[in-house]
Amino acid sequence: VSYTYYSLRHLPYTVLMDITVTAKKDITITGASVMEAPDALRDVQNYYNEIDRPHVVISLLTSSAKSPTGKLLMCASNTFLFSEHHGQEPRVIHEMWDNNMHLMKFSRKIRAGETYRYTIAGSSITSAHHDDPLNEAERATIFAKLEGRERLINFHTKAWDELWKSDIQIDGDAQSQQDIHSMMYHLYSFTREGTALSPSPMGLSGLGYNGHVFWDTDLWMFPAVLVLNPAIA
């Protein structure tokens, strides 16, 4: 079993996850997308909708909740992208486990030696970013479903190719080159053109900084971005 995550560069607030399973013997797998709200959040609401059209069926798993202070409304939505043709996809079932937890799942038989891949697309947004975060999260997820996996990854890759046109190249020191590219990748991962948000000091590694911005950003991060990608700066 392998997983690949794509934080889609061309679609803010949207992520794509590939799950690939290779069977060593005949098996039946059950794949599930579980959405659980942390206990600290308030007024959790869970939604499940199926959009059935002649060309597509979309299973939409959505949750919303208020921040601990009640100031912000936070919303998330996701859907499956199957590799089968329309009309041949596995049946999706919705289950409600608790007030703050629900899931959608499917089952599929896989023969020995067969490799099966399915994908989950999801979006998360708050009222700090949009006046109607619930509909915006669902809209972004529906758009990702309609685009399809291949187009999403293609446009994601093209967006990163544009960023890498501005580069730092080091001759004769492969390790330093790799280190610099790693730093650039992580810096770009937490910044975006068209937003006033500052890069997080700890990225996605934890909640300890709670959104605070420190001198690290101005002293170390901003100058490099200003030189490499002024539009982002």
Regions found by a protein language model. Name each.
Residues 196, 212, 232-233:
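Short, surface-exposed helix-loop/turn micro-motifs enriched in polar/charged residues
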Residues 176-181, 217-233:
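Carboxylate/His-rich catalytic cores and anion/metal-binding grooves
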Residues 1-209:
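Acidic/polar, glycine-enriched structural segments that form the non-catalytic walls/loops
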Residues 206-212, 217, 223:
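Segments forming glycine/polar-rich beta-alpha architectures that bind adenosine-containing cofactors
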